[in-house]
């Protein structure tokens, strides 16, 4: 609160905090593209490796990954069962509507769905994604490599990605009513 008041006095404008997140423990923050995205990633570490400069670089790399790839979840375990069920339902409907797959045996369809669900996890789970700075590694492999190099363990616990303007309601004013209210 005091920080906001001080900032308001300095820039002479009202500041309203519309959304925020607070994590305990080891975190890395990153602001991307002139403020278009803000990312906060929370980690669990061992052996005090979070104090090393290499960990700060690693944390920024992971936050940049979140900014670039926009994952929805940390790992497969964090994906709600309802989301997986809904994805399977969509895939079954697509197969039923496709003449190439509609007449395939149920066992074949289930294998196809398993493959598509693995692809869904690879695209939507941070640790399963291809690491943007090195396409030969996944984020999990990069994390394991950095942890080994630093002599400890690293676990990505959670992350938050804010996008500029996200969640802000646009006011829809009736121009005629606005003019009428000014005239009165």
Stretches with model-predicted labels:
Residues 1, 7-184:
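N-terminal assembly/interaction segments in proteins that build large macromolecular machines
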């Amino acid at each position: 609160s005091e920080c906001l008041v001080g900032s308001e006095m300095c820039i002479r404008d009202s500041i309203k905090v519309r959304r925020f997140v607070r994590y305990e423990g080891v975190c890395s923050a990153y602001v991307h593209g002139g403020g278009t995205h803000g990312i906060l990633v929370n980690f669990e570490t061992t052996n005090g490796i979070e104090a090393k400069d290499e960990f700060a670089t690693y944390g920024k790399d992971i936050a940049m990954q979140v900014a670039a790839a926009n994952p929805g979840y940390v790992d497969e375990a964090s994906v709600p069962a309802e989301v997986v069920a809904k994805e399977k339902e969509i895939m079954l409907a697509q197969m039923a509507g496709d003449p190439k797959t509609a007449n395939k045996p149920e066992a074949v369809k289930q294998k196809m769905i398993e493959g598509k669900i693995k692809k869904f996890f690879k695209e939507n789970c941070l640790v399963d994604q291809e690491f943007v700075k090195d396409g030969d590694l996944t984020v999990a492999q990069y994390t394991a490599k950095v942890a080994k190099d630093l002599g400890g363990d690293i676990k990505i616990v959670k992350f938050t990605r804010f996008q500029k303007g996200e969640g802000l309601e646009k006011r829809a004013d009736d121009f005629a009513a606005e003019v009428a209210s000014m005239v009165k």
